[in-house]
From Swiss-Prot:
Gene of this entry: coaD
The name this protein goes by in its record: Phosphopantetheine adenylyltransferase
Provenance organism: Nitrobacter winogradskyi (strain ATCC 25391 / DSM 10237 / CIP 104748 / NCIMB 11846 / Nb-255)
Catalytic activity: (R)-4'-phosphopantetheine + ATP + H(+) = 3'-dephospho-CoA + diphosphate
Localisation: Cytoplasm
Site feature Transition state stabilizer, where: H18
GO molecular function, one term: ATP binding
Family as reported in the entry's similarity comment: Belongs to the bacterial CoaD family.
């Protein structure tokens, strides 16, 4: 039975931290599905279609190189429901620090109660990407700062275009 993993997130924007998680995740599964969340009430910088396209462009080559099947989808329901829809039994979550661990453990516990067949796997961030958050990247970009150390080149270019003033 193939190991199918779901890596959910808003990916607004895709960061080098997300890319780090994908590099680890493709070694843990036979098929990785990146799920771009669409949440009512949130106003993302990039549309769901843009985030999906950027995620696919950045992550798919990593999966292909690792010999891992890959797909990218959007979802607007519970993460465990999205996992069930695509046949995933593994949820991949990145951890930067203890604060992330505390938060993610709560979510993992709730998810396991709702879907005992779906297991959360935590991937610790590599040291070079631990300080990166999409929120900080957005703040830097909106103020005209250079985000290229924190995001893939494609994303840096899209952010420059988005916030060119």
């Amino acid at each position: 039975m193939p190991r199918v993993a779901l890596y959910p997130g808003s990916f607004d924007p895709v960061t080098n931290g997300h890319l780090d998680v994908v590099r680890h995740a493709v070694a843990l599964c036979d098929r990785l599905i990146v799920a771009v969340g669409v949440h009512p009430g949130k106003t993302p910088v990039f549309s769901a279609d843009d985030r999906l396209a950027m995620a696919r462009s950045v992550f798919e080559p990593v999966a292909v190189e690792a010999g891992c099947a890959f797909d990218c989808v959007t979802y607007d329901d519970l993460t465990v429901a999205a996992a069930h829809k695509v046949g995933a039994t593994i949820l991949v979550r990145g951890l930067r620090d203890g604060t992330d661990l505390d938060y993610e453990m709560q979510i993992a516990g709730m998810n396991e109660t709702m879907a005992p067949d779906v297991h959360t796997v935590f991937v610790p961030a590599s040291p070079g990407v631990r300080p990166i958050t999409a929120t900080l990247v957005r703040q830097i970009a909106t103020m005209g700062g250079d985000v290229s150390p924190f995001v893939p080149q494609l994303v840096a270019s899209r952010l420059r275009t988005k916030f060119a003033g």
